[in-house]
Each structure stands twice: as C-alpha cells, then as structure tokens.
Amino acid sequence: MEKSEAERPVTTEEGEEKPTVPGKGIYHYIAEAWNKPDKSYVKKLQFERLIQWRQEENFLRIEHPTRLDRARKLGFKAKQGYVIVRGRVRKGSLRINKITVRKNLQRIVEERAGKRYPNLEVLNSYWVGSDGKQEWYEIIMVDPYHPVILSDPKINWICEPQHKGRATRGLTSAGKRGRGLRTKGKGAEKVRPSIRAHDRQGK
C-alpha cells in the first residue's frame, strides 16, 4: 500500500530520511477552539478574563496576543516594533431611528486606537470577546520609525507616507469589509471607486 504525502519521510540535506508525524499544528487547535468559544475551553477562560478586562483602562497595551492564530494570520510578529493593544467599544446603535455611523464596531475601535497612539500605525485587528454592553478587540499596531521595521522587507511598506492613517481611511481588513470591497461583480457596482463617488448608494 502506497504511503500518503503526510506519512512519507523527508530527506534532509545530509541524505538522512526523517519520518514526518501526521497531525495538526497548534494554530489549528487554537482556531478550532475560538471558532465556537461557547463549546470549548475558551468559554471558562473568557468568563474570568472579562471580569478583569472591565476594570482595565481602555486601549491597554498588552504583552502577548490572546488569539495567537488570528494575530499571526493578520501580520503580527513577535519582534520589536510590533505592539498589541486591547480596546473596547459599546455595543448597539445610537438609539436614534435610522441614524447610524455606517461603520462596524471593529473599524471604530481601530480608529480610536490610532488616535490614542499617534506614533503607531494600525495594521489589523481581531475580536476577542463581548458581553451585554461591550465588544473587545485586539489591535495590531506597528511603529513605522523603528529600525527593525524599517529593515524588514515584509513590513517596511507601512513606513511610506501614503500609508499614514490607514484606519481612518478604511484601508485595514475591517475597513475594506465595511466599505463593501470584499464583494465583486453583480451587486457591487456602486462600491468602487468609493462609496461617496456614488452618493453613498453602495451601502
């Protein structure tokens, strides 16, 4: 019986065969648990975390990301120049009929974080929790003047002047989703080149 790709041994540079162990990586298990937090170990952790988070100041800089899989997927690296900030925003509407900000809560948190830390640029953000009144997000921020960032070819694009104020211009992942740029073709005729170019009919 022929072995599958996962079971075939890997040949090293010295010519030795190193057997591979089929299985899933740690990021897969983290993502699986966060995909349905109410049915995994995350539920108990979140109950304890939210008690502490409610007492903390808003837009608090933290040492490590709560969701390592999402942080890495959205561009975070454990190196100098990267900063993780946890912020919260109120849930619900403005309580005025038919008057909305036309922005998702994630984008609002990103904009406020950018104002709180004007020397940093918002790279992306991800959801980490909610209760009956508030939503919590962790924002990945980058220092565009840090020498480590300037010398990294994978991220030094953010140091260029045209990328200033990414969050306020809707250029993050959450911003593009809120502007309808995840949709192409039929039904998306009025979202490009911009929402205001079509008198806001794209939303």
Identify the meaning behind each predicted range.
Residues 90-91:
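Polyanion/phosphate-binding surface patch
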Residues 1-80, 94-203:
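Low-complexity, rRNA-contacting terminal tracts
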Residues 84-87:
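RNA pseudouridine synthases
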